[in-house]
Amino acid sequence: MEWELNLLLYLALFFFLLFLLFLLLFVVIKQLKNSVANTAGALQPGRLSVHREPWGFSREQAV
């Protein structure tokens, strides 16, 4: 009885951590897609984009 409870607990913990890992991965991929989309939009010459000063770039990167 004791080892069945332990097994159930370990399985629940394992699947919970797996779920958290996939959630984290999903959020990171979403952020990367947003970052790539913003960069691609800024680099297209046809669009009006906000001009970034080189001295303000490092401050934006830090935030």
From Swiss-Prot:
Membrane spanning stretches: 9-29
Protein name in UniProt: Small integral membrane protein 43
UniProt region (Important for interaction with SLC2A1 and SLC2A3), positions on chain: 7-29, 51-57
GO cellular component: plasma membrane
Subunit: Interacts with glucose transporters SLC2A1/GLUT1 and SLC2A3/GLUT3; the interactions may promote SLC2A1- and SLC2A3-mediated glucose transport to meet the energy needs of mesendoderm differentiation.
Reported function: Required for mesendoderm differentiation. Interacts with glucose transporters and promotes glucose uptake. Probably augments the glucose uptake capacity of glucose transporter proteins to meet the energy needs of mesendoderm differentiation.
Keywords noted in UniProt: Cell membrane, Membrane, Transmembrane, Transmembrane helix
Major site of localization recorded for this protein: membrane
Gene designation: SMIM43
Lipid bilayer topology: Single-pass membrane protein
Highest taxon in the source lineage: Eukaryota
GO biological process, one term: mesendoderm development
Any one GO MF annotation of this record: transmembrane transporter binding
Pfam family, one: SMIM43
Localization per record: Cell membrane
Organism: Homo sapiens
InterPro entries according to UniProt: SMIM43 (IPR054149)
